[in-house]
């Protein structure tokens, strides 16, 4: 399955003008990002917490450097948020369709909300804004022993 996604990513890079031949795709693995989306269902994230369908508008999984990402990359998140803001896109439809200025999506590590607005001018979509916030995760917990005469 990952090989098929890589083929899709390579052809996307070619169509977008990021590469000149499919052979170059292997040397440019960081873009474009490939993600897949689905309507929300109850699921457990990597911490064990259960996310209910009402907690999110859609589910999203993204690939980075040929592998499924353990969470959600910021670049993929803003792209998904923008696609959700454009009526009729696959992302917009997976999120329930219609006009929207934000989308909440579930990913393997939790949930993320992204705001976006875009408008169509002469049949060309222009992104006006995209916003998101992220929560920090604990990187370390411990104690530091400082001698009392240090102060």
Predicted regions span which residues?
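Non-transmembrane, aqueous-exposed alpha-helical and coiled segments at domain scale
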Residues: 1-151
């Amino acid at each position: 399955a990952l090989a098929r996604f890589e083929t899709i990513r390579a052809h996307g890079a070619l169509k977008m003008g990021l590469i000149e031949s499919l052979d170059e795709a292997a040397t440019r693995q960081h873009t474009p990002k490939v993600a897949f989306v689905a309507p929300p269902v109850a699921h457990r994230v990597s911490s064990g917490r259960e996310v209910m369908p009402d907690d999110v508008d859609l589910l999203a999984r993204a690939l980075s450097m040929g592998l499924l990402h353990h969470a959600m990359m910021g670049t993929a998140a803003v792209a998904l948020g923008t696609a959700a803001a454009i009526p009729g896109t696959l992302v917009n439809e997976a999120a329930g369709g219609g006009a929207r200025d934000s989308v909440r999506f579930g990913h393997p590590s939790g949930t993320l909300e992204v705001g976006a607005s875009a408008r169509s001018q002469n049949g060309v979509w222009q992104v006006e804004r995209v916003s998101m916030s992220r929560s920090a995760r604990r990187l370390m917990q411990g104690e530091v022993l400082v001698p009392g005469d240090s102060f």
